[in-house]
């Protein structure tokens, strides 16, 4: 039967990509349906109970700047917060939070259930309705047909999911959930390139069976950071510690002796696993010279004894898992609550997508999250928001949007995926961004919130807070610029004594703040009139101290932008462009890049080839002008 309501956008899947996609589309005012196989698992953290980290927190802050839910849910569910790389420059500093699984999931569900324009329905999706290369809706497992011209697939690890524990395996989307077999079969019928990837998770431990007295305590930071630009530490629940222990020679012996029982090393698993989150058996094999590896025991929540032993993800048989766990100091008597496992699943080559995350072959069909070959909640959430927003824009008859590489880590993520593709689960790092001094986590709102407001993603509450912050920065910079300190005055002498910086003549406070040895807090302690908003103070200090470096990056971006944004016609015949080698012609013809900048990042496409493309575009434009004048 047909569902009586027609929708503008349908989102399949209620994980981190799906929830952000559905919320984004609904915030933009279009009628949105979120279809999930189980309402109770909306926003579930399937693997580690943490949000953020190097590169990842930048994505979370960008999601937040565009009105997304992940950061605010983290503030409501976060039970430990830390700033990573706190002694390094602001470009690579990152916020990381341990989250209570129950509180985080509850915060996401509350947001979903209170979002106007959003309907939630519990049914698995088994089929797509496609007519003349255009999606028209979906069909559920009980034959119910939902109609919409825009569908966002956020299927996670469920497509053809196969769970491995030792040499045994069974079908599953994750532990305790069924896989999506019918939809996987349907998608394989489409003219899209498909592959298999693998990820894994460690056994969960009962904290009552662990001896913490022989481990190293890792408390959170004080003062406690927040994840959202709208967040406050008053939102945080009780804060707890993590604990650090290590594997040892005995652990490594157990693993080495049982590699023949590993599905990874016996050839049972076809999919490639995440390079930057390897299983413990992979670590032992690849880094045989290392005597030990860190294991972080992370609490799963405030109302459970379960611990997540970060660092020992494994798919070895259960008896071996038990030996591994009990060989580690402090866990000699540990009880495993849930075994670790690996899961294989289908993903689709992201080079078959546009920047909007719409597939090139089926109009209105968008992919986001692990279906595109990424790993991580944050990467999924970022793609989900972008896909949901673009599905909404398409339903409104508007142009799609994707931030550039110099505007957001979301732009870096999407450009990497659709230009280069991926052979292994893709994880975000700050090192992937060329302009990371500009793409800091602290200024994500200044980069993106105005655009989010224009798109309809940002509500009045967030916009008011953003405007107050932006105006506060301008006011404080102006105040510092117009406040002067002279030598041989009480303030001048205090500055010289505190910072070891004698004043030789009159300086304004902004000049003084640009010096590396002078910090904002110390300066205003002497001169008075500190701002109340710590985000304003942080921005003023970073912008002042790094002004020269930031200006140089902006100049470089301006030089490159003209060619970067040059559009390539959809009907361009690369095979007919003389001067291009056959290899480059074939690469361009297969990739069909949307811009000159994207073409320049295709492996094997040389700067000389880009110059030839530019000449061809100019000739083509001139020829069309002559035709029109004739």
Curated annotation (Swiss-Prot):
UniProt keywords, alphabetically: Cytoplasm, FAD, Flavoprotein, NAD, tRNA processing
Gene Ontology MF: a single term: flavin adenine dinucleotide binding
Predominant location: cytoplasm
CC per GO annotation: cytosol
UniProt record, GO biological process: tRNA methylation; tRNA wobble uridine modification
Coiled-coil intervals: none
Entry binding sites for FAD: 13-18
Residue positions binding NAD(+): 273-287
Matching SMART domains: GIDA_assoc_3
CC cofactor: FAD
Tagged with keyword Glycosyltransferase: no
Cellular compartment(s): Cytoplasm
InterPro entries found in the cross-reference section: FAD/NAD-bd_sf, GIDA_C_N, MnmG, MnmG-rel, MnmG-rel_CS, MnmG_C, MnmG_C_subdom, MnmG_C_subdom_sf
UniProt keyword annotation of tRNA processing present: yes
Family note: Belongs to the MnmG family.
Known role: NAD-binding protein involved in the addition of a carboxymethylaminomethyl (cmnm) group at the wobble position (U34) of certain tRNAs, forming tRNA-cmnm(5)s(2)U34.
Binding partners and assembly: Homodimer. Heterotetramer of two MnmE and two MnmG subunits.
Protein name from the UniProt record: tRNA uridine 5-carboxymethylaminomethyl modification enzyme MnmG
Organism: Pseudomonas aeruginosa (strain ATCC 15692 / DSM 22644 / CIP 104116 / JCM 14847 / LMG 12228 / 1C / PRS 101 / PAO1)
Gene of this entry: mnmG
């Amino acid at each position: 039967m047909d569902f009586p309501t027609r929708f503008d956008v349908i989102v399949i899947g209620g994980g981190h990509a799906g929830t952000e996609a559905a919320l984004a589309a609904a915030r933009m005012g279009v009628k949105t349906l979120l279809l999930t196989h189980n309402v109770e698992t909306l926003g579930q953290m399937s693997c580690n109970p943490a949000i953020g980290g190097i590169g990842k927190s930048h994505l979370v802050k960008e999601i937040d700047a565009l009105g997304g839910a992940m950061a605010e849910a983290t503030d409501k569910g976060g039970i430990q917060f830390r700033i990573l790389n706190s002694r390094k420059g602001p470009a690579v500093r990152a916020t990381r939070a341990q989250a209570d699984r129950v509180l985080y999931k509850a915060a996401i569900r509350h947001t979903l259930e209170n979002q106007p324009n959003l309907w939630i329905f519990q049914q698995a999706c088994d089929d797509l309705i496609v007519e003349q290369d255009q999606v028209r809706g979906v069909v559920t497992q009980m034959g119910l047909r939902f109609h919409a011209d825009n569908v966002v697939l956020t299927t996670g690890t469920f497509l053809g999911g196969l769970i491995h524990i030792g040499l045994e395996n069974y079908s599953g989307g994750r532990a305790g959930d069924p896989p999506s077999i019918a939809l996987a079969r349907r998608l394989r019928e489409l003219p899209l390139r498909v592959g298999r990837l693998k990820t894994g998770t460690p056994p969960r431990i009962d904290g009552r069976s662990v001896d913490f007295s022989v481990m190293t305590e890792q408390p959170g930071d004080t003062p406690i950071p927040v994840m959202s630009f709208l967040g406050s530490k008053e939102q945080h629940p009780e804060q707890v510690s993590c604990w650090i222990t290590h594997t040892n020679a005995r652990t490594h012996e157990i693993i080495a002796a049982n590699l023949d029982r590993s599905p990874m090393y016996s050839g049972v698993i076809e999919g490639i696993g995440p390079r930057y989150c390897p299983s413990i058996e992979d670590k032992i094999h690849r880094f045989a010279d290392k005597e030990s590896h860190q294991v972080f025991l992370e609490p799963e929540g405030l109302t459970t004894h379960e611990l997540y032993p970060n660092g020992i993800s494994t798919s070895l048989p259960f008896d071996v898992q038990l030996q591994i766990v009990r060989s580690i100091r402090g866990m000699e008597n540990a009880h495993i609550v849930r075994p670790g496992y690996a899961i294989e699943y289908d993903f689709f080559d992201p080079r078959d997508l546009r920047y909007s995350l719409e597939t090139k072959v089926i109009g209105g069909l968008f992919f986001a999250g692990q279906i595109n070959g990424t790993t991580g909640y944050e990467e999924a959430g970022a793609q989900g928001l972008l896909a949901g927003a673009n599905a909404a824009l398409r339903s409104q008859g508007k142009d799609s949007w994707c931030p550039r590489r110099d505007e957001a880590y979301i732009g870096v993520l999407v450009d990497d995926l659709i230009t280069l593709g991926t052979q292994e689960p893709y994880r975000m790092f700050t090192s992937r961004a060329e302009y990371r001094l500009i793409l800091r986590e602290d200024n994500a709102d200044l980069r993106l919130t105005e655009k989010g407001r224009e798109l309809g993603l940002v509500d009045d509450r967030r916009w008011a807070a953003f405007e107050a912050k932006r105006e506060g920065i301008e006011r404080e910079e102006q105040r510092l610029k117009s406040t002067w300190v002279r030598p041989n005055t009480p303030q001048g002498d205090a500055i010289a004594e505190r910072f070891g910086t004698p004043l030789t003549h009159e300086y304004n406070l902004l000049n003084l703040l640009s010096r590396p040895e002078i910090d904002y807090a110390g300066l205003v302690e002497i001169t008075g009139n500190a701002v109340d908003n710590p985000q304003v103070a942080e921005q003023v200090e970073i912008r002042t101290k790094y002004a020269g470096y930031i200006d140089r990056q902006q100049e470089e971006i301006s030089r490159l932008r003209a060619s970067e944004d040059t559009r390539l016609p959809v009907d361009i015949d690369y095979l007919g462009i003389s001067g291009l080698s056959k290899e480059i012609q074939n690469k361009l013809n297969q990739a069909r890049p949307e811009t000159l900048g994207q073409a320049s990042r295709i492996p094997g496409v040389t700067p000389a080839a880009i110059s030839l493309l530019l000449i061809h575009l100019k000739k083509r434009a001139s020829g069309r002008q002559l035709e029109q004048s004739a």
